[in-house]
């Protein structure tokens, strides 16, 4: 009896049960929005059903399983904001150009492209707002093309239906116990520190470059993933506020440990120094858990406190960062109030946000959306096809949502396959099942819920076309009040969806994104600026924490150039130089301060230069200024510990001058 009850309790914690629970959650959200839509006498309950499906299924498709607590609520809030922005934009466009329908449609295409451009520049988690705002305005304008005076009424109805769908999705998420991410955060914190210690062991033992590269590459990705978990934890509940602050600083400590371990490796490669036997004894011991690392760090602290001679300064810094990491990790697990020591750690640095390095990429994305919607508009106007508006809307939806993803073509293919799958599936529902349920609301809900349950399982597997099939099938089912079954209109809408997705895919493939090289060069020059900006006599500027921004750009570099290990190493060296130059004890001097400002201004000119010749000229000027600056430091009779890092930075920039400037 005990064995069977234990087996049953274990089943409720398995991934299989989580998938079934989410599929039921999706079905409940869709059925509830359908029932309330008809009960409240909404004109088109289809919009509320479609909204509930997209809000609930979108995060699951992105996560590859049941989304964590708070993800659906956050998605719903973003959709509400984007819908209101799109409605306001549509009203402004219609009021300004009500007497010129063609100009109105062209302005709508420009609006969609502009929103896509903005969505490519903002944070990924907020990009959904602007992508949605772009195609919402287009949907409203296209839907009211024949009756522009009814636009305010249509906008209000559309907002009401969308809000109803979002409320249903959030209610379903709350009722069916979404999983908390807190346990995953605690587990990731421990695993991350264990991997950090293993990287330190590799660095101190003089392992080959390939092993070091693989280790720090994996650590950068895990640290970035932990930062993403922090965002999800804050979406879950406001009670994690203190843990959120600790995780923000813990992210910085993790990046510092990566930097210190890699710098230790480079120092030992340049100047091979035998490691003290006592340190080697501690470092050679394997670690398997957070407790093991805690014991090793404690032993290292005692050894350094007893005799810090012949201990690399970077190892001392690593132990300090690991100590702060352990302190913050304990606070995250307990989620208690911040103590004095933790508050000092949190207030020690001022994190700096980096501007986007994908401005050219964003312009290409906006151009793709604008051109695609304009082509759809011309196709609609030239053919006079009744479902041309459906084609145009699908073009806007696909191009607006796909552009922010790393692989827009794959997203467009998902929508294309989804619309193709939706044709037979929708025909089965529309021609055979739904007409038989007109006398019973219960049968209608069961039929639609069964379809949603099946597609909900496929969405979590990230099956190609699953998310597109769910949205496209609901879109072509005439869930209006009262319901009508016009087969020719159904086929027109289904074919219009397919043609729209095909045209969107063609535009994405034809308008190629050739900004990859430009983005890579911009990112590398941002690392150069990050290194030289650490040269300062201003204490407030020295407290600025550029590490999260620099590693965020490094993570983008890893994604844009997945196989270019030379770029990773150069970027990591520049991050190491930033961290080393930040700790230099440069005396207060007006001449040095003026030279610091000049060096930063020249580095900014290198980043902003549009032509290769101009960029090369400014880069050569930057090298000359760094050499003169090193001479000034020597004339000030500063020790080699201050002048040598500047010379090392100048040497790195000179060695990679061609890659950074041309």
Swiss-Prot record:
This protein's record includes keyword Nucleotidyltransferase: no
TM stretches of this protein: 22-42, 52-72, 76-96, 102-122, 129-149, 161-181, 378-398, 415-435, 439-459, 465-485, 491-511
Keyword Membrane on entry: yes
A single GO cellular-component term on record: plasma membrane
Listed InterPro entries: PHBA_efflux_AaeB/fusaric-R, PHBA_efflux_pump_AaeB
One example GO MF annotation: transmembrane transporter activity
Recorded family membership: Belongs to the aromatic acid exporter ArAE (TC 2.A.85) family.
Protein name (record): p-hydroxybenzoic acid efflux pump subunit AaeB
């Amino acid at each position: 009896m005990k064995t069977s009850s234990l087996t049953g309790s274990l089943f409720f914690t398995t991934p299989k049960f989580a998938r079934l629970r989410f599929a039921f959650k999706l079905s409940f959200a869709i059925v509830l929005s359908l029932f309330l839509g008809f009960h409240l006498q909404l004109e088109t309950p289809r919009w509320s059903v479609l909204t509930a499906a997209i809000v609930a299924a979108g995060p699951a498709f992105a996560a590859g399983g049941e989304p964590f607590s708070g993800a659906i609520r956050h998605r719903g809030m973003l959709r509400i904001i984007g819908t209101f922005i799109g409605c306001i934009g549509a009203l402004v466009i219609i009021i300004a150009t009500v007497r010129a329908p063609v100009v109105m449609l062209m302005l709508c295409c420009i609006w969609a492209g502009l929103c896509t451009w903005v969505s490519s520049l903002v944070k990924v988690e907020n990009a959904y707002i602007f992508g949605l705002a772009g195609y919402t305005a287009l949907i409203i304008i296209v839907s009211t093309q024949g009756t522009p005076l009814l636009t305010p009424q249509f906008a209000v109805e559309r907002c009401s239906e969308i809000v109803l769908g979002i409320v249903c999705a959030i209610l379903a998420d709350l009722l069916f116990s979404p999983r908390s991410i807190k346990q995953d955060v605690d587990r990731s914190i421990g695993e991350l520190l264990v991997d950090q210690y293993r990287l330190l062991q590799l660095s101190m033992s003089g392992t080959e470059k390939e092993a070091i590269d693989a280790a720090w590459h994996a650590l950068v990705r895990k640290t970035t993933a932990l930062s993403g978990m922090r965002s999800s934890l804050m979406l879950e509940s406001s009670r994690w506020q203190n843990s959120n602050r600790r995780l923000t600083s813990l992210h910085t400590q993790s990046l510092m440990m990566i930097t210190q371990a890699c710098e230790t490796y480079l120092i030992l490669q340049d100047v091979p120094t035998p490691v003290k036997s006592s340190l080697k004894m501690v470092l050679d011991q394997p670690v398997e858990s957070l407790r093991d690392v805690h014991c090793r760090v404690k032993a290292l602290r005692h050894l350094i406190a007893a005799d810090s001679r012949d201990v690399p300064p970077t190892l001392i810094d690593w132990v300090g960062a690991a100590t702060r990491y352990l302190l913050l990790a304990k606070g995250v697990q307990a989620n208690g109030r911040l103590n004095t020591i933790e508050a000092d750690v949190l207030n020690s640095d001022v994190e700096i946000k980096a501007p986007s390095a994908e401005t050219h990429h964003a312009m290409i994305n906006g151009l793709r959306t604008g051109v695609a919607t304009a082509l759809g508009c011309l196709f609609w106007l030239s053919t006079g096809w009744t479902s041309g508006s459906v084609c145009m809307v699908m073009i806007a939806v696909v191009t607006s949502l796909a552009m922010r993803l790393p692989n827009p073509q794959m997203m467009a293919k998902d929508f294309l396959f989804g619309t193709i799958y939706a044709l037979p599936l929708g025909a089965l529902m529309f021609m055979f099942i739904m007409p038989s349920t007109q006398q019973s609301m219960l049968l209608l809900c069961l039929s639609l819920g069964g379809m949603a349950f099946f597609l909900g399982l496929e969405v979590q597997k990230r099956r190609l076309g699953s998310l597109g099939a769910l949205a496209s099938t609901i879109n072509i089912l005439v869930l209006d009040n009262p319901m009508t079954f016009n087969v020719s209109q159904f086929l027109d809408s289904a074919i219009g969806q397919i043609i729209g997705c095909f045209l969107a895919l063609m535009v994405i493939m034809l308008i190629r994104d050739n900004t990859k090289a430009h983005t890579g060069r911009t990112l590398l020059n941002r690392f150069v600026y990050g290194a030289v900006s650490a040269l300062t006599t201003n204490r407030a500027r020295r407290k600025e924490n550029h590490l999260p921004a620099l590693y965020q750009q490094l993570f983008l570099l890893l994604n844009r150039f997945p196989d270019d290990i030379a770029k990773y190493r150069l970027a990591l060296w520049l991050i190491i130089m930033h961290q080393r130059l930040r700790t230099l004890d440069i005396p207060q001097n007006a001449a040095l301060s003026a030279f610091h400002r000049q060096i930063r201004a020249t580095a900014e000119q290198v980043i902003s230069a549009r032509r290769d010749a101009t960029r090369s000229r400014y880069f050569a000027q930057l090298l000359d200024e760094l050499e003169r600056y090193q001479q000034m430091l020597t004339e000030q009779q500063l020790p080699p510990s201050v002048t040598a890092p500047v010379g090392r930075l100048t040497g790195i920039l000179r060695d990679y001058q061609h890659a950074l400037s041309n």
